[in-house]
Amino acid sequence: MEYYDLGSYTRTITTPAPDAQLWFDRGLNWLYGFNHAEAIACFQKALELDPGCAMAYWGISYAAGPNYNLPWHLYDPAGKAAALAAAYDAMQGALARADGASPVERALIRALPARYPQRETIEDQAPWDAAYADAMREVFRANRDDLEVRHVFAESIMNLTPWKM
């Protein structure tokens, strides 16, 4: 897989595979650059290298869902269904592997069900966004010094009022 190098930012995750760590970091960099499709491709590559990597599943789940630039209400019905299915399925993979993750990784993973409480779409996902922001507030309270937690918590709040900052 060809890769455009965005830099050396890293977040150490629970994985025995250095190459899975590398591809997770690449996915995180693309995620923070709002190229979610490329982020997902990198997280999937990390999973190829370490199928037990809970955080690679977390990355896919997080990146497949809504964001400040593409909130749920801007998806067309087919796109919303596909995104939710991908996010929900990856979340299940992360949850199934969470026991082997670090405490902060487990907290990030265990916040995801508030973001994706079901696989089927509903008319208005705004309550899901609010529930996820509440879940991330608790993760933040327990991990105030963690930069990723700060980022994900801040983005969860931003997603409550997309394009209104």
Predicted features along the sequence, with ranges:
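Short coil/linker segments at helix-helix boundaries
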Residues: 1-52, 57-145, 152-165
